[in-house]
Amino acid sequence: MSTSLNYKSFSKEQQTMDNLEKQLICPICLEMFTKPVVILPCQHNLCRKCASDIFQASNPYLPTRGGTTVASGGRFRCPSCRHEVVLDRHGVYGLQRNLLVENIIDIYKQESTRPEKKLDQPMCEEHEEERINIYCLNCEVPTCSLCKVFGAHKDCQVAPLTHVFQRQKSELSDGIAVLVGSNDRVQGVISQLEDTCKTIEECCRKQKQDLCEKFDHLYGILEERKTEMTQAITRTQEEKLEHVRTLIRKYSDHLENVSKLVESGIQFMDEPEMAVFLQNAKTLLQKIVEASKAFQMEKLEQGYEIMSNFTVNLNREEKIIREIDFSREEEEEEDAGEIDEEGEGEDAVEVEEAENVQIASSGEEESLEKAAEPSQLPAELQVAPEPLPASSPEPFSSMPPAADVLVTQGEVVPIGSQQTTQSETSGPSAAETADPLFYPSWYKGQSRKTSSNPPCTHGSEGLGQIGPLGIEDSSVQSAEVAEAATNEQAAVSGKESSSTAATSQIGFEAPSPQGQSAALGSGGGADPEPARHVFSFSWLNSLNE
């Protein structure tokens, strides 16, 4: 207890001496005042030597002798408060000495040179003659042996001071080391945070610069577009103004001519001589009639001057601009992942479809080889192909919708031969009631005969599907065509010319004139044999080859 008090008193005395030393420092030489010490009128103190140096520096042109100013009088400023000090004829020697400060300096020097008192071993407060030599572990205070034997610590555990001293000293040293290490780590974290601040500032500066550049680019685009649209309005304005001004000039010239004509007519009305009047009246009347009939006023369209076609609606663009925001990398990565997954799924579906097509095509090739022979038409129904007329401009799309066909490797089969529905079995088909120009006879006959067959499972899949059904029916078609050709109505012959022109562009070939005349000759009488329309698709077969 007494040791701590002594230590506190010693530290307090040392602090007092340090504060006193600060008050005894000269503001010029920054050292302790040297006697004699003079006091200025502003109550600040200076060494006389320092005051003389300031005076000489302020008055450099005054004569000196032995380093001192000879002339009397002068002035200088206080170095502490800049107050002007006026000297009398004695100069700096006329300033009063501060004896109090000189005495304090002497006392301070004596105390500072006195040897330090050695602190003796502290004594026990209860037993003044006993030294503190043990440490109470329970109370955690140093004490003496008598306190352990008879005093307040007789029931406590004690230990020698040296053991406790070494232990606490090591603990204190370890604690200091931990604090030092912690301070180093904190300092490292502070350095990292400072670097992070610099990085943040640099990155933000770059992002701001990039953002400004992008917005400047947008500004440039808007300005460019604004200039282009303004120029378009200006061009239209000039064109319309030129047109209107042309009309103004035209009407002005006409008005001027009519005014002159009216003026001359009024003057001619005052002619007193009837003979002269009648001689010139016809010519004047003719001019008036021509002027009234020849001139036609051109009226401008309604809203010609409004320029409503240049109205701009920027609501959508304004909404888009207001929704401009920073892009998020996480959302972009998720979108990219979803797109990749969708692409992989589509690739897998395409691979499966390609495999199925390969398998189907392999089976179809075998069936095509077997059914290639019976697909030929009878020789009596085949007609030599004639070249298409070069002057027919009708496109391929002029083909009648009922003439859709199914293309296979060996031949071309009409779709109607593969598609059978419930309506065909219950009543007359649409091909029977339709115009024969759009539906050939063999197509109607085949639809009637094949209505009892089971419906095709793959015939409704659309044009271009290849299957064995088209090949199996090809042999039946040859006989059906021959039978259906004899059942054509007489109305077909009346529309033969238009049907031939409509179908000549897409591969339908009509019989030649020689064949028609032969058919008429063989039929004889008033009931000639109806013309036969044969479909030739040899040019499609050549494409497959």
UniProtKB/Swiss-Prot annotation:
A Gene Ontology cellular-component term: cytoplasm
Sequence ranges assigned to domain COS in this UniProt record: 269-327
Example of a GO MF term: protein-macromolecule adaptor activity
InterPro entries listed in its UniProt record: COS_domain, E3_ligase_FN3/SPRY, Znf-RING_euk, Znf_B-box, Znf_RING, Znf_RING/FYVE/PHD, Znf_RING_CS
Keywords: Coiled coil, Cytoplasm, Metal-binding, Muscle protein, Nucleus, Transferase, Zinc, Zinc-finger
Null allele phenotype: TRIM55 deficiency does not affect B-cell development in the bone marrow and the transitional stages in the spleen. However, mutant mice display an impaired germinal center formation and antibody production. Moreover, TRIM55 deficiency suppresses the activation of B-cells in response to various stimuli such as anti-CD40 or BAFF. The double deletion TRIM63 and TRIM55 mice die in utero and peri-natally and exhibit a spontaneous cardiac hypertrophy from birth. Mechanistically, hearts have decreased E2F1 occupancy at promoter regions of multiple E2F1-regulated genes compared to WT.
Catalytic reaction annotation: S-ubiquitinyl-[E2 ubiquitin-conjugating enzyme]-L-cysteine + [acceptor protein]-L-lysine = [E2 ubiquitin-conjugating enzyme]-L-cysteine + N(6)-ubiquitinyl-[acceptor protein]-L-lysine
Acidic residues bias spans: 328-352
GO process annotations (BP): diapedesis; leukocyte migration involved in inflammatory response; macrophage migration; positive regulation of non-canonical NF-kappaB signal transduction; protein K48-linked ubiquitination
Biased composition (Polar residues): 417-428, 486-506
Disulfide bonds: none
Keyword DNA-binding among record annotations: no
Induction: Expression is inhibited by the LPS/TLR4 pathway.
A Pfam family this chain is assigned to: zf-RING_UBOX
EC number(s) stated in the UniProt entry for this protein: 2.3.2.27
Zinc finger (B box-type): 119-161
Biased composition (Low complexity): 474-485
Role noted for this protein: E3 ubiquitin ligase that plays an important role in regulating cardiac development and contractility, muscle growth, metabolism, and fiber-type differentiation. Acts as a critical factor that regulates cardiomyocyte size during development in concert with TRIM63 by regulating E2F1-mediated gene expression. Plays a role in apoptosis induction in cardiomyocytes by promoting ubiquitination of the DUSP1 phosphatase. Promotes non-canonical NF-kappa-B signaling and B-cell-mediated immune responses by mediating NFKB2 'Lys-48'-linked ubiquitination and processing.
Annotated protein name in UniProt: Tripartite motif-containing 55
Organism: Mus musculus (Mouse)
Underlying gene: Trim55
